[in-house]
Structures are given as C-alpha cells and as structure tokens.
Amino acid sequence: MMKQLRTSGKTFAVIFMVAFIAACSGNTKQNEASQEAERRAQEAAAEAQRKEERLRDAISAAGDIIYFAYDSSVMTTEGRRVADAHIALLQTNNSNVKLEGHTDERGTREYNLALGERRANAVRDYMVVNGVSSGRIETVSYGEEDPVAMGSSEASWSQNRRVAIQ
C-alpha cells in the first residue's frame, strides 16, 4: 500500500509538472505574441512619424504661400504644387488648416476683401476636390489690410497677392 501510494504520488508529481510546464509554455507564447504585436505597433508609429516628417520637409520646400496674378483667383501650377504638399500632410493627420486671402492695395477695400475671399475659396475648393474635408478648412480674407511688402510697385504688389496657409 505504501509503495502504491509512493508510485501514485510520483505519478501525480509528474502530471503536475507536465501541466505546469504546459501552462508556462502557453504564457510564453502569449507573451511572445504580445511582444510581437507591440513591436509592430512601434514600427508602424515610427514609420508614420517618418512619413509625416518627410511631408513637413516637402511643405518647407514648397512653402506656405500661394501667389496669384493681378485681379485673379485662379491658382497657378506653382500654387497647386504648394497646395498639394499641404494636402498630402492633411491626409495623414487630423489637423485643420486656415487659408488667409490677401490682395495688393489697388482697388476698393470692399472689392479687395471679396477678391481675397475668392482666392482663399479657390484654394479651399482645390483641397476639397483632392480629398481634404471642408470641415477642416477655415477661410478668411484680409483684403489689402495685411501686406507683406510695402510700396506701390509691381514687385511689392505681386508679393501681396496671396493666400497664406496656416
């Protein structure tokens, strides 16, 4: 009877050890899977950050200003290139953008406010057509009220006919 008890005790101990090892190996697999998922998430976050940095670099190169011809709200090829850089960044995050329309000093105050608004709206419409939600875009017109270049020459006026992207 004592021998049988020792044998069943040993059997129980072996069964217990096998069960314990099996349980531990299951946790190891879960831990490995968890660590792998965390590693992938970190890699994805790092890649997203690198992509956003590349887009910000592209915006720095393209600029934040879209220029317009005299008495026009039609975007130029260069203006579309600037807007495209901002669109690419806006499509990677949930930030909003403010488009500030400006004019040169020629024309009445009322006319220039309306022209600045048409310019800001032209850029907004281009962004919306290219995938940016209109709810993320604010437009405002300053008309001739906030010039970047003082003077009454074509060189000054051309710098003031713009939409600033904020």
Question: Which residue stretches match the model-derived regions?
Answer:
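Bacterial N-terminal signal peptides that target proteins for export
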Residues: 2-13
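A generic local structural motif
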Residues: 2-3, 83-85, 150-151
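A short, structure-level motif marking secondary-structure boundaries and short turns
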Residues: 5-6, 72, 107-110
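C-terminal motif of bacterial Sec signal peptides marking the signal peptidase cleavage site
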Residues: 19-23
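Periplasmic peptidoglycan-binding/tethering modules of Gram-negative envelope proteins
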Residues: 25-97
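Periplasmic OmpA-like peptidoglycan-binding domain that tethers envelope proteins to the cell wall
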Residues: 102-166
